[in-house]
């Protein structure tokens, strides 16, 4: 499967004997929704993930390659090879030194970002691996997939720690709470389940969707979860109680990816209707619709500084988000 509005005027000026002149960038480069760069390779891209510092954008491809590109220019930095199936999900370690890749080949691989060398291969799943997430303290990785399980394992040794079996169908997405104490998992069984990350003890099940739940994201402050579904909605709900707070119905087809802005005020959602929509997290009021793609948008990622969004369809596009 698969802009920054100018904060202030660009000033040109001079400093006697030291600075002669400067020229402003095109105004269009600073407009909300302006496309900064695009990428379309020989192999389809399925996922994108920003490095914690925002310097790099990692891409997972159908041919099993993981690419790391300069986030400003789109220029290829290096590629990593090892998977024998499509790379469906990526997660950077919080310190940006490693990246985990989840693949249809049934493995999760951990790579060194300084050298591109493969460090670990986790083989605990019995089917395609569709989701991977790094714990906030960098010690653990959680992965999930078509076998219906979520597995937590040691990020340094690949030693298995626990398996969560609360779902009855494919687990398509997962996320750690910002404090690292809980995990949320989204499934084709139409539910999102929240559970204790250290014991696997179930906390509660959210049943607001009427079809496959493809995606979820925890708010930066840990109080809310947003989940997107084939039912075409994004639902925002209280992460402690499961109470629904907002239902967003702006899309005309299934929603496959959601992401919170770093300040927690907005949510971006990517849909099979070929759009990415940005809207207020508290009210559901639409702020902007990005229409740069011509096919299903299957993945998106918000840059750490909140200024840009990377979205993935038949092509990858990086565009101004504020």
What are these regions (language model features)?
Residues 1-7:
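N-terminal secretory signal peptides that target proteins for export/translocation
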Residues 11-21:
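Bacterial N-terminal signal peptides
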């Amino acid at each position: 499967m698969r802009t920054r509005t100018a904060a202030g005027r660009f000033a040109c000026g001079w400093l006697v004997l030291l600075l002669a002149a400067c020229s402003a960038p095109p105004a269009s480069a600073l407009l909300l929704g302006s496309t900064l760069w695009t990428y379309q390779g020989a192999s389809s891209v399925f996922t994108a993930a920003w490095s914690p510092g925002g310097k790099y954008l990692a891409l997972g491809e159908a041919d099993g390659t993981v690419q790391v590109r300069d986030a400003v220019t789109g220029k290829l930095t290096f590629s990593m090879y090892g998977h024998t199936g499509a790379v469906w999900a990526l997660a950077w370690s919080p310190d940006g030194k490693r990246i985990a890749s989840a693949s249809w080949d049934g493995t999760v691989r951990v790579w060194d970002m300084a050298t591109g060398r493969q460090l670990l291969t986790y083989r605990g799943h019995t089917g395609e691996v569709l989701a991977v997430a790094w714990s906030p303290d960098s010690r653990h990785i959680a992965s999930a997939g078509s076998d219906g399980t979520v597995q937590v394992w040691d990020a340094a040794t690949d030693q298995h720690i626990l398996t969560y079996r609360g779902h009855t169908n494919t687990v398509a997405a997962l996320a750690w709470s910002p404090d690292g104490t809980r995990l949320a998992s989204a499934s084709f069984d139409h539910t999102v389940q929240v559970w204790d990350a250290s014991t696997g003890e179930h906390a509660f099940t959210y049943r607001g969707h009427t079809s496959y739940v493809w995606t979820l994201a925890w708010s930066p402050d840990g109080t809310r979860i947003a989940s997107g579904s084939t039912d075409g909605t994004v639902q925002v709900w209280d992460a402690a109680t499961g109470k629904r707070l907002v239902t967003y119905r702006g899309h005309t087809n299934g929603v496959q990816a959601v992401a919170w802005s770093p300040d927690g005020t907005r949510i971006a959602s990517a849909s099979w209707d070929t759009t990415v929509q940005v809207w207020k997290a508290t009210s559901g009021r639409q702020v902007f619709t990005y229409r740069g793609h011509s096919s299903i948008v299957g993945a998106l990622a918000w840059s750490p500084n909140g200024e840009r969004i990377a979205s993935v369809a038949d092509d990858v596009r990086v565009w101004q988000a504020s």
